[in-house]
């Protein structure tokens, strides 16, 4: 290989130079244009879609159909396009038709009140009503102190309750609340203790009662007065809030339950409600917002107060001081947590915006209210606002009214002659309305097309009849004495006639055969130092070894002596030479021992025995 053909050294090579601008321009020119689908005609642009009212959700649904880009100039055949081709040719027309169909649905058709089922709780008014979030059960409480659990899966056409409970003895049930998973039922009554029940209706915990002699509400561990309302956090199944006449709202957590005391020993947070003069006011109702960011309370002075969840709860974040002229009976958030409904004793229903607490958005007057538990609320999608009215006399019926949330115009009404309607629940999953009345009955409204499960499975379930009294049974005569085993066999005298004696004798014989005499088996031999609590030999355990060393081996010689006097006298010489106690003290002062012979001569000269000094008679 010559020098001309030899490879060049690295030092002689030149670095390559890249033109970034040219490369970027070439990349842009070669990149595929994906702004518009190639199978959509050019006449339909993005601007036309926005003008026609196509929502972002519709565009996102089309983008979910993943397919490669088609080559330019490609046209689909009419047979291949199918029904989707008409959609591509005129999206504006299809969207307009869908919009018109939505507008055609009236608000009345959104209320599931085509059918009705009637359930009896008792003879007293319904004071509490709540459906669990899964929609399998619901609970009702009344002025008769009872809580009744209704299970849709177990009920038939009789509409009978599943369980009847008396959780608070002689206290009125004020409020009920189910946990988001339906495992726990919280009962608020006329006492200061909140009861927690499981699915079977058994109480597994309760809250501690506070000290009513302590003024500071932060120091007391629990409520000191009647609990008016309880509500679970929609985002936390272990947290719930309660309000009481002691002027406080308290946050509790199920994780604080103590197994030993079977009690929640202390609250997590305390929220104080104060009036315009700074004094304590009693909250009557409390609730969480659906997104869990707000806690609201309605007080007996007519004020609506709300706090942001997780704050210090010192200052109120939302306050309407004169929301109503009387006590507030119910408050409810809208599904978007931006509006608030309030119902008061001033016979009004008001809607508030969380952005503007000065003036209500809408006001509805003339709604009779005679119960402190009259509910109000939104439908699951906020198309309707509902509330109940009371019946002041037999001529004026109580009603369940539905209003337009934009104007508060009455769109639907259900009358109850001479009966008040105050407890109302609209379950979002079942799409059924449950109303509690003042006569102790519960009315469930549903629609066969819009509603699902719930009471619909009960109205079609046949009623089971009690047939115990209709069964014809064959009577049997039992005469055991006629059997051969009880016949007399060679007995003489009265034994032939005493039949009871023969029965007892036979039973004793059978009993002895069935129960043989118990014999304790012999112990198995021990292989080792110990087994089954037994020691093989003395000294096999630490206790035996110590006892042997301290007691037996040390006193072996002493135990051998049978003559006690001789064993003591053998130490006499040593004690005389080396005294330890008394003799050592008298060695110098009294070297010669002098013993007392007698104190006083006895009167009886014949008695030569000496008597103790303390027994000698006194001499004159």
Curated annotation (Swiss-Prot):
GO cellular-component term (any): nucleus
Region annotation (Disordered) ranges: 28-99, 593-620
Record bears the keyword Repeat: yes
GO biological process, one term: establishment of mitotic spindle orientation
Biased composition (Polar residues): 75-87
Acidic residues bias spans: 600-610
Annotated consequence of substituting residue 324 to N: In ct226; temperature-sensitive
WD repeat segments: 121-160, 168-207, 222-262, 278-317, 323-362, 415-455
UniProt entry tagged with the keyword RNA-binding: no
Pfam name, any one: WD40
Sequence ranges of Low complexity compositional bias: 43-59
Keywords, ordered alphabetically: Developmental protein, Repeat, WD repeat
Function: Required for initiation of gastrulation.
Similarity-based family: Belongs to the WD repeat GAD-1 family.
Name of this protein: Gastrulation defective protein 1
Organism the protein comes from: Caenorhabditis elegans
């Amino acid at each position: 290989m010559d020098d001309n053909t030899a490879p060049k050294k690295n030092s002689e090579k030149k670095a390559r130079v890249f033109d970034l601008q040219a490369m970027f321009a070439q990349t842009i020119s070669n990149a595929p244009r994906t702004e518009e689908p190639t199978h959509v005609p050019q006449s339909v642009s993005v601007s036309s879609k926005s003008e026609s009212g196509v929502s972002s959700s519709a565009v996102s649904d089309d983008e979910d159909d993943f397919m490669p880009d088609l080559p330019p100039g490609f046209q689909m055949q009419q047979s291949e396009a199918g029904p989707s081709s008409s959609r591509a040719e005129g999206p504006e027309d299809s969207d307009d038709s869908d919009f018109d169909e939505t507008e055609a649905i009236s608000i009345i058709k959104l209320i599931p009140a085509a059918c009705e089922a009637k359930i009896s709780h008792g003879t007293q008014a319904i004071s509490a009503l709540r459906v669990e979030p899964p929609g399998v059960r619901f609970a009702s409480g009344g002025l008769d102190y009872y809580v009744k659990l209704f299970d849709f899966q177990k009920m038939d056409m009789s509409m009978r309750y599943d369980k009847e409970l008396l959780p608070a003895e002689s206290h009125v049930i004020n409020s009920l609340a189910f946990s988001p998973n339906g495992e726990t039922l919280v009962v608020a009554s006329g006492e200061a203790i909140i009861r927690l029940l499981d699915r079977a209706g058994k109480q597994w915990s309760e809250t501690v009662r506070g000290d009513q002699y302590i003024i500071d509400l932060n120091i007391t561990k629990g409520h000191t007065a009647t609990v008016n309302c309880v509500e679970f956090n929609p985002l936390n199944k272990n947290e719930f809030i309660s309000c009481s006449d002691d002027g406080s709202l308290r946050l509790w957590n199920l994780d604080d339950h103590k197994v030993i005391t079977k009690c929640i020993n202390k609250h997590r947070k305390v929220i104080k409600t104060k009036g315009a003069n700074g004094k304590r006011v009693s909250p009557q109702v409390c609730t969480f917002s659906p997104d869990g960011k707000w806690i609201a309370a309605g007080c007996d002075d007519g004020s609506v107060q709300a706090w942001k969840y997780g704050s210090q709860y010192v200052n109120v974040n939302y306050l309407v001081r004169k929301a109503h002229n009387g006590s507030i009976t119910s408050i409810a958030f809208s599904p978007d947590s931006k509006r608030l409904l309030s119902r008061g004793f001033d016979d009004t229903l008001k809607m508030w915006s969380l952005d503007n607490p000065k003036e209500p958005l809408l006001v509805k007057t003339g709604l009779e209210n005679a119960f402190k538990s009259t509910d109000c609320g939104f439908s699951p999608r906020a198309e309707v606002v509902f509330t109940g009215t009371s019946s002041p006399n037999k001529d004026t019926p109580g009603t369940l009214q539905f209003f337009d949330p934009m104007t508060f115009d009455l769109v639907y009404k259900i009358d109850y002659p001479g009966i008040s309607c105050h407890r109302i629940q609209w379950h979002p999953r079942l799409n059924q309305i449950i109303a509690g009345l003042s006569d102790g009955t519960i009315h469930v409204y549903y629609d066969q097309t819009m509603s699902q499960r719930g009471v619909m499975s009960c109205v079609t379930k046949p009623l089971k009849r009690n047939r115990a009294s209709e069964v014809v049974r064959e009577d049997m005569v039992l005469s055991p004495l006629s059997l051969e085993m009880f016949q007399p066999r060679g007995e003489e005298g009265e034994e032939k006639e005493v039949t009871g004696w023969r029965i007892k004798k036979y039973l004793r014989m059978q009993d002895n055969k069935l129960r043989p005499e118990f014999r304790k088996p012999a112990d198995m031999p021990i292989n080792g130092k110990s087994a089954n609590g037994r020691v093989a030999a003395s000294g096999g355990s630490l206790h035996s070894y110590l006892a042997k060393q301290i007691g037996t081996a040390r006193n072996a010689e002493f135990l051998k002596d049978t003559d006690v006097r001789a064993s003591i006298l053998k130490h006499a010489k040593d004690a005389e030479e080396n005294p330890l106690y008394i003799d050592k003290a008298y060695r110098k002062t009294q070297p010669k021992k002098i013993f007392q012979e007698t104190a006083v001569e006895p009167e009886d000269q014949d008695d030569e025995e000496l008597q103790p000094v303390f027994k000698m008679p006194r001499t004159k």
